[in-house]
Amino acid sequence: MDLKKYIRDVKNFPKPGILFKDISPLLADGEALNYTITSMAEVAKDVDVIVGPDARGFLFGTPTAAVLKKPFIMVRKPGKLPGKVISREYDLEYGNNILQIQADFIKKGQTVAIVDDVLATGGTIKAIIKLLKEQGAIIKKVIILLELTDLNGRDSINEDGIEIVSLVKF
């Protein structure tokens, strides 16, 4: 299935000069959504845990984990997860941010696939990789719906042994 047909361009969103890749048409089409989740699950079938960042990583990571009957671990911004959390600060284009996971869900030696909607600069994924490695996880795969190749995110997260799979590249 050609998933590019289900991703539309929106000019000047979220601000002037930006060409936004809108995945809403894909989410609104049951067959395209099913194909996406099935494809992601096929790639992730040999890992122990699926991890995804808030918010759109949840849209693809949770159903991927459910199809595989594997746990899904949320990565969120501060103050969104109860209990003991592990934090990692990371740089953005203009400033920085913090990501957190709950401390008791990742076990040392577990293999992980990170699932998200878009790979742009790679900053978020790189921070998640560091956060998970600090917990002793083995990151095997990064599975992305849409990769913006001009932004070189793949290069910024390319580490030994991590397979990066994008279903669509622009």
Swiss-Prot record:
Catalytic activity: AMP + diphosphate = 5-phospho-alpha-D-ribose 1-diphosphate + adenine
Lineage, top ranks: Bacteria, Bacillati, Mycoplasmatota, Mycoplasmoidales, Metamycoplasmataceae
EC number: 2.4.2.7
Pathway in which the depicted protein is active: Purine metabolism; AMP biosynthesis via salvage pathway; AMP from adenine: step 1/1
Stated name of the protein: Adenine phosphoribosyltransferase
CDD domains from the UniProt entry: PRTases_typeI
Free-text function comment from the UniProt entry: Catalyzes a salvage reaction resulting in the formation of AMP, that is energically less costly than de novo synthesis.
Major location (coarse): cytoplasm
